[in-house]
């Protein structure tokens, strides 16, 4: 009896030891080992069994704080209390109730009642620092160092002289009386009279010389260039009217050249001088005025 009891006890001890080893293995695999490193990172080590093989996985994690700078007005709006279905929601748009659209570039147009001479002077003043030209300002009425629109003698000297200047700026051959009653004429509508480029006897298709003077042709352009890339590079020299990147009809890939049209000739000239020979995406761009099609 004692011998049988002794064998029984040994069998129970063996089973108990085997179960303890399995529990230890399960505890080792289920509990990840987390170590805090001296450089601020954290290492997590885990183990797993797959097809009788033991695998060890080590992951290093580094926490970084990213500071985002926003305008003061945006920060103030984020503190507003939400209402309705969004009452109590955290700051920022909720994807469940708010749809975020694409960014739209909003360009303010010219005022219809603003004289052309004031428009050109304001745009020239805005473009001068970008172009880097050191030219003085001279009044067309009293020859003083100020803009014509700011002339203190405008009421006295701005009669027939201003009317004649308006007629010359429009580039027409009409009498002075017609120039007095006319308002601002956009560049694409100028010289539309008889003999002008857009009228009878002018250039075919209503195309004027101003189109070529305002449009730049960009060649040796990267195939990865987009309209946004050109607007970003050429937009700092003046207001852009349109950008066209030529693409292949079959593949849709850019063909290596594009056209950029400005609203003022001075802006186009400044962009030509600055961007001709400029590097973009490992290529040297060639910039020149667009040529007419025969």
Swiss-Prot record:
Predominant cellular place of this UniProt entry's protein: cytoplasm
SUPFAM superfamilies documented for this protein: RNA-binding domain, RBD
Domain RRM: residue ranges: 214-292
Bias type Gly residues, positions: 193-205
Pfam families named among the record's database cross-references: eIF3g, RRM_1
Single Gene Ontology BP annotation: formation of cytoplasmic translation initiation complex
UniProtKB keywords: Cytoplasm, Initiation factor, Protein biosynthesis, RNA-binding
Record protein name field: Eukaryotic translation initiation factor 3 subunit G
Gene source species: Yarrowia lipolytica (strain CLIB 122 / E 150) (Yeast)
């Amino acid at each position: 009896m004692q011998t049988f009891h002794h064998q029984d006890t040994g069998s129970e001890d063996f089973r108990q030891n085997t179960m303890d080893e399995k529990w230890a293995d399960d505890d080792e695999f289920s509990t990840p080992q987390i170590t805090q490193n001296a450089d601020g990172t954290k290492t997590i080590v885990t183990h797993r069994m797959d097809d009788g093989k033991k695998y060890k996985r080590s992951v290093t994690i580094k926490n970084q704080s990213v500071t985002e700078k926003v305008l003061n007005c945006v920060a103030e709006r984020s503190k507003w209390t939400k209402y309705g279905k969004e009452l109590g929601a955290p700051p920022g748009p909720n994807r469940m109730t708010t749809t975020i659209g694409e960014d739209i570039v909003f360009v303010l147009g010219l005022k219809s009642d603003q004289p052309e001479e004031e428009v050109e002077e304001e745009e020239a003043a805005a473009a001068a620092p970008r172009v880097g030209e050191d030219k003085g300002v001279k009044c067309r009425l009293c020859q003083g160092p100020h803009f014509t629109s700011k002339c203190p003698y405008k009421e006295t000297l701005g009669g027939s002289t201003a009317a004649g200047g308006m007629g010359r700026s429009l580039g027409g051959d009409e009498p002075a009386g017609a120039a007095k009653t006319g308002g601002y004429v956009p560049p694409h509508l100028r010289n539309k009279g008889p003999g002008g480029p857009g009228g009878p006897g002018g250039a075919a298709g209503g195309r004027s010389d101003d189109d070529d003077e305002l449009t730049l042709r960009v060649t040796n352009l990267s195939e990865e260039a987009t309209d946004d890339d050109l607007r970003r590079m050429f937009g700092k020299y003046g207001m852009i009217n349109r950008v066209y990147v030529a693409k292949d009809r079959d593949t849709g890939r850019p063909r290596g050249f594009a056209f950029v049209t400005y609203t003022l000739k001075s802006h186009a000239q400044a962009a030509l001088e600055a961007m001709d020979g400029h590097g973009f995406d490992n290529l040297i761009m060639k910039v020149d005025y667009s040529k007419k099609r025969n």
